Amino acid sequence: MPTNAPSLTVAFGTGGSFTTVSQDYILSVNTRRGRVQQNVFLTAGTADVVLNNMSGNFDPSNTASPWYGVLIAGMQVRIQGNGITIFTGYLEDNVVNQGDYPTVSLTFVDGLAQMGKAIAPALATSQYQETAAARAARALDLADWPAGARSLTGTTTMLATAQGLSCLDMLEQCANVVGGRFYVSRTGVATLVPLANKFSRPTQLLFSDQGDAYSVGYDGIITNPGTDYVYNEATVFRGPGVLQYSAKYNASVTTYGLKSKKLDAPVSNTTSAANLALYAARKDADAVVLAEQIDFTAIGIGALATDFLETELNDLVQVKRLTYDGRSITINSVVEGMAQTITADNWRVSIFTSVVDPYTIAI
């Protein structure tokens, strides 16, 4: 791996017991978690690991391999930098290249894939009027997700459900109901956080093109004036046959025109539903300059490597930018997703962000 970059470790395992893969075999690692922008549906994180297979050890049909019987669908992976976990997941695909330079390409997915494949069986009648945290726990139970790998917070009560949808869809509803987010952490913990969580997240990194103290320099940035992300009308869809709630922020409509969105959010309490609609109509109603994507190289960043490696989805970062005409702009951002490409001579990172909105309301 590159000099002055974090020390990369890839380990395969079963049942929570891991064995480290020798550095000599690792050709490249690509990970992606989260999403590239806010207000998009949950998708599974992925990790693509390419290994030198001249030894034949990573051919799953090689009965003499120490990995024989282990290198199968569902095998666990743990990827770390400086001993800090940056991805955990399960083997989904294995492509063996038997050419002049034999390689094996392994594709891993995180827990969202397991939740997306699991279906909550339809019920004859709607049942389980419960909090968002309890509903999320029910969905995770149906997906056979381990009880010890959960962190679920959400006290808003949801309407009874007839199920008949994927467990991931249920979890998306839970996140919508609490105005928060659901994700699987870099260490494999299924996490539901409510609206209030955004006010307690750490600011992990300062990115700057001006050489500020304790900052990480970036070499690429994509900014957006924010008009693409304006929404000023929101409808809370609580389900068929019940009253739906909508809200509109007229000042924004006057400036940008009507931009509407619908939340699949079966909120039980009508006051909570009305407040959720108000919040959803207001939080993205202003066009604010945002840093959609920040690109940098994780080489030679010293002690800040720990902060970078520990950065989690929904954490906060700051971006300082000096414009061509001499203005210094600071953008406060929330991490929506991350992608990393690690090779023998580089460690490239892209962080995808949205603007931290300052609004809150009781839901």
Where would I find each of the regions flagged by the language model?
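Acidic, small/polar-enriched beta strand-loop surface segments
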Residues: M1-L27, Q127-Q129, D169-A344, I351, ...
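N-terminal export/assembly leaders
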Residues: G116, A136-A162
